[in-house]
Amino acid sequence: MVANTSMRLNQVAPVPIQLEDHGPNQLEPTHISDVLVGEHHTIKGENGQSYVVWAIRIIVNDSIYSSIVLYKRYREMEAFRNKLLDEFGNEIPPLPPKDSMSLQKLTNPLAWLEERRKGLQWFMTNVLLNPRWQRSTVVREFVLG
């Protein structure tokens, strides 16, 4: 009985497939349309030291389904800003201060981290949504590297 069923299945012609693209015009250049600096994650390094990485969600072409999520340390964002300064000069906005040993960081670390997140959000929004900077090699390497 099973052999007979599989024979009948083999005799059925496949349904033709037609691919349709309902997305944006492929000739339009890709652009960053939004950026969200989200939660932080504390990572324990190989040497036992802990450090914080930030989740950065980059929305591409106004579609929440086309997004890239990065996890970056503050020092990586600092290096990114320095490369932008080399290419574009002092037009680049500042990052929030490093504050490695601030009183607020020691007494209320969650409030300090939220202030840091807001500062990083402001920086990333001003840099990545600027049409002049977002197409630069520096931004491409930061996002895709």
From Swiss-Prot:
Topological type in the membrane: Peripheral membrane protein
Primary localisation category: membrane
Domain PX span(s) in chain numbering: 32-145
Compartments where located: Endosome membrane; Vacuole membrane
Entry GO terms, CC: endosome membrane; vacuolar membrane
Gene Ontology molecular function: phosphatidylinositol-3-phosphate binding; protein-macromolecule adaptor activity
SUPFAM superfamilies associated with the record: PX domain
InterPro entries from the UniProt entry: PX_dom (IPR001683), PX_dom_sf (IPR036871), Ypt35_PX (IPR037917)
Keyword Membrane in annotation: yes
Gene Ontology BP annotations: protein localization to membrane
Keywords: Endosome, Membrane, Vacuole
Record flagged with keyword Zinc-finger: no
Summary of the function given for this chain in its UniProt record: Recruits the lipid transfer protein VPS13 to endosomal and vacuolar membranes.
UniProt free text on domains: The PX domain binds phosphatidylinositol 3-phosphate (PtdIns(3)P) which is necessary for peripheral membrane localization.
Annotated family: Belongs to the YPT35 family.
Entry protein name: Endosomal/vacuolar adapter protein YPT35
Species this protein is from: Meyerozyma guilliermondii (strain ATCC 6260 / CBS 566 / DSM 6381 / JCM 1539 / NBRC 10279 / NRRL Y-324) (Yeast)
